[in-house]
């Protein structure tokens, strides 16, 4: 069993995963001025709340898109596990066949998503990861990572609208009953939820055209939290929502870098006969 953290600009997703699957997941606000001791206390309390003795942890791994927080979080993990965390980046084995202009610029979160998706699902595929930004990763029929797109995330778009205008309020994010809003709150919610769903549907169609694939040939996966699940449920294309995708990818990468990938591999139940590009 290992301790795994996925660090975004807004949140830190923490979890324990092992041969038997995911033991727990938790989420913290990413606070840049916290010390390693404060994060160590947060992590330790989370382990205790979920009944996981820290002595049982064989290792730890971090995927981070916030470099200034890396040292503090690595120290926090080392304090509670006594082990040096594996930080995903250049030099860490992931097994991906990356075909973009500068592979070193590919975000660690996108690497983790792709590793997990290739282990669980059939290529060609699109992987949507919705957080501070909405990202898409495209894997072609040969299992190669060929690119994607990045757009502003739903929450940051709503926050920009509320802070940059005089009359638009901050609203809770949920799907209204109708696309046509009849008050300001419902209009904002419709734009956020149905507008994002429409963007995703439109990009799926365009990506399929560029790949020369029929839309039904694409496996479309999305990961994220409750809001992202709500959005994907409003899409017209069939989308697999996998909220354990990131943890599964972190587990696979950790195994690959221990020289024991084949002996402890946790295969996803929905995996089909994908090309093994490892």
Predicted regions and their residues:
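A short, acidic, amphipathic alpha-helical segment used as a generic capping/interface helix at domain edges
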Residues: 196-212
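Gly/Thr-rich phosphate-binding beta-strand-loop-beta motif of the actin/hexokinase/Hsp70
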Residues: 1-24, 117, 123-145, 161, ...
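Short beta-strand-loop/turn "lid" adjacent to the catalytic site in phosphate-handling enzymes
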Residues: 50-106, 142-149, 153-154, 182-193, ...
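Alpha-helix termini
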Residues: 48-53, 208-214
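Glycine-rich phosphate-binding loop plus the immediately following alpha-helix
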Residues: 31-38, 106-108, 113-122, 146-192, ...
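Glycine-rich phosphate-binding/hydrolytic loop that grips phosphoryl groups
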Residues: 111, 166, 239-278
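N-terminal glycine/serine-rich phosphate-binding loop of ATP-dependent small-molecule kinases
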Residues: 1-88, 92, 265, 278
């Amino acid at each position: 069993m290992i301790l795994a953290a996925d660090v975004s600009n807004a949140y830190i997703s923490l979890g324990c995963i092992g041969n038997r699957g995911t033991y727990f997941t938790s989420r913290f606000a990413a606070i840049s001025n916290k010390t390693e001791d404060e994060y160590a206390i947060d992590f330790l309390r989370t382990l205790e709340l979920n009944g996981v003795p820290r002595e049982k942890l064989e290792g730890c791994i971090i995927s981070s898109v916030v470099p200034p927080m890396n040292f503090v979080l690595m120290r926090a993990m080392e304090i509670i596990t006594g082990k040096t965390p594996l930080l995903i980046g250049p030099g860490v084995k992931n097994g991906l066949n990356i075909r973009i202009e500068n592979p070193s610029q590919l975000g660690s979160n996108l690497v983790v998503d792709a590793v997990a998706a290739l282990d669980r699902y059939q290529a060609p595929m699109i992987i949507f990861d919705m957080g501070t930004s909405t990202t898409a990763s495209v894997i072609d029929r040969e299992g190669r990572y060929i690119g994607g797109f990045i757009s502003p995330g739903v929450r940051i778009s709503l926050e920009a609208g509320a802070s940059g205008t005089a009359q638009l309020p901050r609203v809770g994010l949920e799907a209204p009953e109708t696309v046509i809003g009849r008050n300001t709150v419902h209009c904002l919610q419709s734009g956020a939820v149905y507008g994002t769903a429409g963007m995703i549907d439109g990009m799926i169609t365009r990506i399929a055209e560029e790949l020369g694939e029929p839309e039904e040939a694409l496996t479309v996966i999305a990961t994220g939290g409750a809001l992202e699940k709500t959005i994907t449920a409003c899409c017209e294309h069939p989308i697999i929502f996998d909220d354990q995708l990131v943890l599964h990818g972190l587990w696979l990468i950790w195994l690959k870098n221990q020289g024991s990938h084949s002996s402890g591999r946790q295969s996803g139940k929905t995996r089909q006969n994908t090309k093994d590009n490892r």
